[in-house]
Structure formats: structure tokens, C-alpha cells
């Protein structure tokens, strides 16, 4: 599973404090859902999360639960405080590599 906040890069340029606040809320919502569905967060890149799961049902359940939780959260907030994410799903073998240690 890959997640990414919509508009986060622009927001960090416009209002860094708000961007960091929303990122913390984002993490408070998403992390427990991934954990509940036996997922593992294997990488973070700013506002993006890469998580792995052993079963396809766990991936789908997590994606639906995350979008539902964010929708409920966003109803209570103004447009400028909305957290909107994109989620990409893939099922199959995953190869993770630490590119920091690769010499070019």
C-alpha cells in the first residue's frame, strides 16, 4: 500500500506549521488502522507511507477504513484543514532495497 497526502508539498510552502499539524493528524488516523489490519509500515517519505500486508483482504480493509476515517474527520473541518490522500494498492511480492548504500 502506498499513501500520499494531496497538496502537502504546496502546503508546506504556504503554511509549514499547519502542514506539520495535519501530518501528525494523518499519522494518528492511518497508523492504527494499518496496525489493526496486521500491516507493517516499511517506509516513510515525507507525507507518504509504504506499508506491507500478508493478505489482500488486509490491504483492502485498511484502504477502506482509512478513507472512511478521513471522510468523517474532514466533515468536522474547514476546507483548508482537510486531509485528502491517494492510496495505491498492489498485491504480490515486494522487494525493498536501501538505495542510500548503493554506489553509483
Description of each model-found segment:
Residues 1-65, 69-72:
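Catalytic NTP-binding/metal-coordinating core of nucleotidyl cyclase/transferase enzymes
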Amino acid at each position: 500500500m502506498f499513501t500520499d497526502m494531496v497538496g502537502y508539498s504546496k502546503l508546506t510552502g504556504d503554511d509549514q506549521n499547519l502542514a506539520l499539524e495535519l501530518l501528525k493528524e494523518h499519522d494518528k488516523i492511518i497508523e492504527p488502522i494499518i496496525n489493526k489490519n496486521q500491516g507493517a509500515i516499511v517506509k516513510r517519505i515525507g507525507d507518504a507511507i509504504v506499508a506491507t500486508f500478508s493478505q489482500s483482504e488486509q490491504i483492502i480493509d485498511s484502504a477502506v477504513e482509512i478513507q472512511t476515517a478521513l471522510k468523517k474527520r474532514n466533515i468536522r473541518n474547514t476546507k483548508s484543514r482537510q486531509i485528502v490522500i491517494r492510496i495505491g494498492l498492489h498485491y504480490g511480492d515486494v522487494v525493498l532495497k536501501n538505495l542510500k548504500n548503493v554506489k553509483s
